[in-house]
UniProtKB/Swiss-Prot annotation:
Its EC number is 4.2.3.6. This is Trichodiene synthase. InterPro entries: Isoprenoid_synthase_dom_sf, TRI5_ascomyc, Trichodiene_synth. Disulfide bonds: none annotated. The gene is TRI5. One of its GO terms (molecular function) is trichodiene synthase activity. It catalyses: (2E,6E)-farnesyl diphosphate = trichodiene + diphosphate. TS is a member of the terpene cyclase group of enzymes. It catalyzes the isomerization and cyclization of farnesyl pyro-phosphate to form trichodiene, the first cyclic intermediate in the biosynthetic pathway for trichothecenes. It serves to branch trichothecene biosynthesis from the isoprenoid pathway. It comes from Fusarium asiaticum.
């Protein structure tokens, strides 16, 4: 395995953060912890229900880690929406992460998908059954146009995960395949449309801005994720079907060339995102900026992405990019580094056990000693 291109990664990250003028001021520390705990608590109780536990069949530690990651993403990035909307989105996106980590073949349970949908019957696929049950709680926050985007993008995501079950990075020469798969499983339209709850935005009045935001967010959000995930995925056997690796296969180029391709497209998208909305509705621009900055903070601070390892590796280096990266990392950590023990309690497994015993009051107590074990 070749060595990770640290210097290149530092330069790319610094340029990205400079392009978006990174300065996360979305919350005070108290507000961040309050929103994290509210969204987490509602979502944890949701996934602790017997039906969810029985149908999802997810390892408790994996479910706990997935929920904490997603709550962080939503709270940090969807800074303008209500706490209730944050909680409902956290549940929805946790379902998507659970599916993304699944290895079950969806084919048998999807044979009668449309017939069941048309007849109003419960879906045979357990993931769809649970997601459809929760969808009204999500869609109540949005107008019909944004809701349609959420539904359609979630269906695309399911199909993208289905394709990934085959561990297929594309045929050499199939230049369209990498971006096709990344758009399919990126949830870009779902994310882009879920920034505009109807209590804050009239989707008819802001239709053009919202449509453009959905279009721009489709690429920006997934490309930034791919760049910030590149380190953790570099030598992980489970993450070899990535956009960068698929560029290598389909475009028949080197890994360095593939990373440069992603870098240039991400930086161009970042420039566009800032420029296009600079003279538009100030509330729209503020929402987009808060999302961009919060999304970056989440990546820099969430243990899943292991970027603290890069920081520790280069913090004593004297290069300009190393110093800039460390400054940005410290800036993010100052606002976003919040220990799970401060908000992610009680654990889902504990709630599920308490529900089984019927002791609801006991379920409200924090269990800080065990929560620290979950990254």
């Amino acid at each position: 395995m070749e060595n990770f291109p640290t210097e290149y990664f530092l330069n790319t990250s610094v340029r990205l953060l400079e392009y978006i003028r990174y300065r996360d001021s979305n919350y005070t520390r108290e507000e961040r912890i309050e929103n994290l705990h509210y969204a987490y608590n509602k979502a944890a109780h949701h996934f602790a229900q017997p039906r969810q536990q029985q149908m999802l069949k997810v390892d408790p530690k994996r479910l706990q880690a997935s929920l904490q990651t997603i709550v962080g993403m939503v709270v940090y990035s969807w800074a303008k929406v209500s706490k209730e909307c944050m909680a409902d989105l956290s549940i929805h996106y946790t379902y998507t992460l659970v599916l993304d980590d699944s290895s079950d073949d969806p084919h048998p349970a999807m044979l009668n998908y449309f017939d069941d949908l048309q007849a109003g019957r419960e879906q045979a696929h357990p993931w769809w059954a649970l997601v459809n049950e929760h969808f009204p709680n999500v869609l109540r926050h949005f107008g019909p146009f944004c809701s349609l985007n959420l539904i359609r993008s979630t269906m695309d995501f399911f199909e993208g995960c289905w394709i990934e079950q085959y561990n297929f990075g594309g045929f050499p020469g199939s230049d369209d395949y990498p971006q096709f798969l990344r758009r399919m499983n990126g949830l870009g339209h779902c994310v882009g449309a879920s920034l505009w709850p109807k209590e804050l935005f009239d989707e008819r009045k802001n239709f053009l801005e919202i449509t453009t935001a959905v279009a721009q967010m489709e690429n920006w959000m997934v490309w930034v994720n791919d760049l910030m995930s590149f380190y953790k995925e570099f030598d992980d056997e489970r993450d070899q079907i990535s956009l960068v690796k698929n560029f290598v296969t389909c475009h028949e180029i080197t890994l360095d060339e593939a990373l440069e391709k992603l870098t240039q497209e991400t930086l161009h998208s970042s420039k566009q995102m800032v420029a296009v909305f600079a003279d538009k509705d100030p509330q729209v621009m503020d929402t987009i900026e808060c999302f961009m900055h919060g999304y970056v903070t989440w990546h820099l601070c969430d243990a899943r992405y292991r970027l603290h390892e890069i920081y520790e590796k280069v913090k004593d280096q004297d290069t300009e990019d190393a110093k800039k990266f460390c400054k940005f990392f410290e800036q993010a950590a100052n606002v976003g580094a919040v220990a799970p023990s401060e908000w992610a309690y009680p654990q889902v497994a504990h709630l599920a056990n308490v529900r089984a015993k019927g002791d609801v009051k006991e379920a409200q107590k924090p269990i800080l000693s065990s929560i620290e074990l979950v990254e």
